Amino acid sequence: MRQVERHWIKEGHYLYPICDDLTFKAKNLYNAGLYQIRQSIFERNKCQEEEKPSVLSWTELVSQFRKEKQGDMLALPSKVSTNILKILGFSINSYYQLLKGFHDKSNPSVTNKPRFPRYLHKTEGRYVVEFTNQTFSKKRGSNGELILCPKDLKLPIPTKVEDPQCVRIVPKLNAFVIEVIYNVEVSLLKHTGTYAAIDLGVDNLASSTFSDGVNPLLVKGTKIKSINQGYNRLIAKAKSKLPANQKTSQGIHRLWRNRELKLQSELHKVTSFLSLYFDEMSIEKVFIGKNQGWKQEVTLGKKINQTFTQIPFTTFISQLIYKCLARGIEVVEQEESYTSKASFVDQDEIPTYGKGNEKFAFSGKRVSRGMYRTKNGFLLNADVNGSYNILVKGLLALGKSLDREKASFHTRSLKNWQFVANKDLLLQYM
């Protein structure tokens, strides 16, 4: 399994001008390569013969540029420039794959028509630079730095990773992110027969239920909401002061960057806690609810929609997946349509959206903020009801069933965000 160590390089850092220069040269090579590929596509479309010429591949592009001694390619180390054109080639292939999926009406995975890769801005554009382990020096720097391209650049990268596989310089919001990618060993998957499910939301960021009767655990999302709302106000205020013909500024980029870093920090705390918690509970598999296009089609009201779409749930899921996998726990993304509407207590059938049953009738309903009422008038937490239904769906996909008699509805809430994922604190929630 691969993990990433990230270093944010802001203006004023000694590596900033080097990163800026490399990504600028990478942009020039990207634009030059894209131009050649576009020309080959135009020639193919103009051709009237039955056997049309093929679109220029990235390998052919590398050979052509080397033969011509193309200036943008010579401006970068050979292996680095090759990787840039390779990434461009993969982007072109991805475009055609997505376009094929968009025109395939039987495949609903691609809902919006993809756009062909575009040229980057001549002066402001920057592009990703990737260094494989073939460009690393065998010797480290005086302070343990990883040395990239020792013959050409001699670029020192501060890292604690002993055996990195790849290094990327990614331009992001007027800054650069140096990503050091490395491999980690994965623990053997558990086979305990105990399962958990997570329902993601706004007020309750993660509502966890369990198959063995353990009380549900609610991780509150109040701090995430507070961060979003605070930065939304600051960004709106900054935008109101911009000239009419200006869309953004360095100050706004700085606000977006700080917002992302704070959200990343909070999500890391939560996912670290949950992965340790599931490990201590001997959970074999975790089902986490997610629907295709859920952020594009959400209809929860204007204010809640804004908060829901701004919370990086995909980041949360990816963090939880690799942290649980490191502990031998598998995380499965489970389709969750109708799980919030169906009554878990009344054992309602939970259909799948888009199979002709959109008008399905359910025994209970949501009656107030955060509460669900069953057919017999029993009130329970609405997110707990949804989480249990996700658990039912997940187990059904495995050919198993949930013992509903063991289900507990007495929730425990995790409100303190200043926690560290350790076993001493964990005992308070078990």
Q: Which positions does each model-derived feature cover?
A:
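Nucleic-acid substrate recognition interfaces
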Residues: 1-430
